[in-house]
């Protein structure tokens, strides 16, 4: 009998992808081939109302702790921390000691803990918060938020705007093998940890944090070739095709009005050469998602080979919505890309290129929702997610509102570990959603529970069916026509695409939500930057 099945506790595999669109997987309406993920979804529950932070590091902080990111040292990303926030409690830039991570809790309860991929929870020397120090017995990690997917940015000369990429194996300095592909490499490292622990009878907690499909857009040429003819009609056509498929799958009601596309240039205004360039970018992006699916298939096979697959609970989600920032024309990336990247058409997708998908493709991926990564609109914080395996209903779907803070308490409950607060540590704000996963409950959060967001000058708050958002002025760099620096109000039950602002029609409801947001801000210690 495999050692994992000798006891009663489940193994866990949490897979986090980076900047992936809500409809990229074919099981969510996309055209990209994702058979391995689709098979896991068919064996589990599709989570269609899962929410995160608008940006990656803050989402990861909440996943790891079950707490709001402002409470645990990650009030914002170090890369965009303002002078007003620097030195303030909650803005340390690494996971602070006032909270226990899910890896620490599981390790202390007898789990073997391992991770491979993106860390981004302490990117500044002396690296006060590294994977091993925060509960992972084995780890191979990128410390920062992005990197060249082939390892081509590990020196001062080749490092991009964030400097040379920094890697740690079990918290010790290590180099990424030049020419290896990040998605394959991280999957192989995790499988290697499986093999190293084949004689270890302890249950496992495995965390696989892909850096794909985060820019730069890079993928093996043979995979890019599979999609070179797929996107020649442009993002608007892709958006309509995905929406139609979502309706067939029951992911969007026929009455759902999709958000209006904002920013960027309409396809028909581009020259043939510009269209060809854009189509290749999206082909590379699709290849990144395809490669990620293929890597997941290898990890799942590793679980099967070890006899642990049937005992494993798998959770999968994207850390935020797709990225619509056109980095080629946006500081601080613009000047570096112009000076260092080779973005000729035939080179896009290779090690020496650096491109991004931009706002039009991103809104095809986030449809029917409003906007994308960085913003508190649904397109930025409502992400593709599912659960599969032990303790999860099969061929199911849940529309229950779920939050990334719910993952840690859910794993603790499934492991039979008391979720009660540890002495000297913060209590978790998230709730266990185990009942939603196994189909015994339809909701996890109370209908009137306050859910709030704050990041990078942006704000958001949800009460019941109502949601108010406050978009920062930076959105005007991408889409000047989008209202900024004022509160917008939407009824998500009637208008999930956030298409109709009801702020003027419902001033009392808006004030109720704004008051709720300021109560949240005081509670978690938000430092609102000057000019926000």
Describe these PLM feature segments.
Residues 1-483, 487, 496-522, 526-532:
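Formylglycine-dependent sulfatase
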């Amino acid at each position: 009998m495999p050692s994992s099945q000798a006891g009663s506790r489940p193994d866990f595999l949490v897979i986090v992808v980076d900047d992936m669109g809500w409809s990229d997987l074919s099981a969510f309406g996309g055209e990209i081939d994702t058979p391995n993920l689709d098979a896991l979804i068919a064996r589990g529950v599709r989570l269609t109302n899962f929410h995160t932070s608008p940006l990656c590091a803050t989402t990861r902080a909440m996943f790891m702790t079950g707490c709001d990111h402002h409470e645990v040292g990650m009030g914002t990303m170090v890369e965009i921390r303002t002078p007003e926030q620097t030195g303030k409690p909650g803005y340390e830039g690494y996971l602070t000691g006032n909270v226990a991570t899910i890896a620490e809790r599981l390790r202390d309860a007898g789990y073997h803990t391992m991770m491979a991929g993106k860390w981004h929870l302490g990117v500044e020397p002396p690296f006060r918060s590294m994977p091993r120090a925060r509960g992972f017995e084995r780890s191979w990690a990128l410390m920062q938020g992005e990197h060249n997917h082939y390892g081509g940015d590990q020196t001062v000369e080749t490092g991009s705007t964030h400097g040379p990429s920094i890697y740690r194996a079990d918290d010790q300095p290590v180099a990424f093998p030049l020419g290896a592909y990040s998605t394959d490499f991280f999957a192989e490292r995790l499988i290697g940890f499986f093999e190293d622990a084949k004689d270890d009878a302890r249950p496992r907690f495995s965390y696989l944090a892909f850096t794909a499909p985060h820019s730069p857009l890079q993928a093996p040429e043979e995979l890019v070739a599979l999609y070179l003819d797929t996107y020649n009609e442009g993002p608007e056509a892709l958006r309509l095709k995905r929406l139609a498929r979502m309706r067939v799958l029951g992911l969007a009601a026929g009455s759902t009005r999709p958000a209006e596309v904002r920013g960027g240039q309409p396809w028909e205004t581009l020259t043939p050469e510009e269209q060809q360039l854009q189509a290749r970018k999206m082909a590379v992006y699709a290849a990144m998602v395809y490669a990620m699916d293929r890597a997941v298939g290898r990890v799942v096979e590793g679980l099967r080979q070890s006899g642990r697959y049937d005992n494993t609970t798998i959770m999968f989600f994207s850390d935020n919505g797709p990225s619509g920032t056109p980095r080629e024309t946006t500081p601080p990336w613009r000047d570096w890309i112009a000076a260092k990247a080779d973005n000729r058409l035939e080179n896009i997708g290779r090690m020496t290129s650096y491109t991004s998908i931009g706002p039009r493709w991103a809104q095809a991926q986030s449809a029917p929702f409003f906007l994308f990564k960085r913003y508190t609109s649904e397109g930025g914080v409502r992400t593709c997610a599912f659960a599969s395996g032990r303790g999860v209903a099969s061929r199911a779907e849940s529309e229950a509102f779920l939050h990334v803070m719910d993952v840690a308490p859910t794993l603790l409950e499934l492991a039979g570990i008391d979720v009660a607060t540890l002495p000297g540590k913060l209590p978790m704000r998230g709730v266990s959603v185990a009942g939603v996963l196994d189909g015994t409950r339809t909701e996890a959060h109370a209908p009137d529970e306050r859910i709030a967001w704050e990041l990078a000058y942006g704000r958001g708050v949800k009460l019941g069916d109502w949601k108010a958002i406050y978009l920062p002025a930076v959105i005007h760099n991408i889409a000047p026509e989008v209202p900024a620096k004022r509160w917008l109000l939407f009824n998500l039950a009637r208008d999930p695409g956030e298409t109709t602002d009801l702020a003027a029609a419902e001033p009392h409801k808006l004030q109720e939500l704004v008051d709720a947001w300021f109560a949240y801000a005081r509670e978690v210690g938000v430092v609102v930057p000057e000019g926000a």
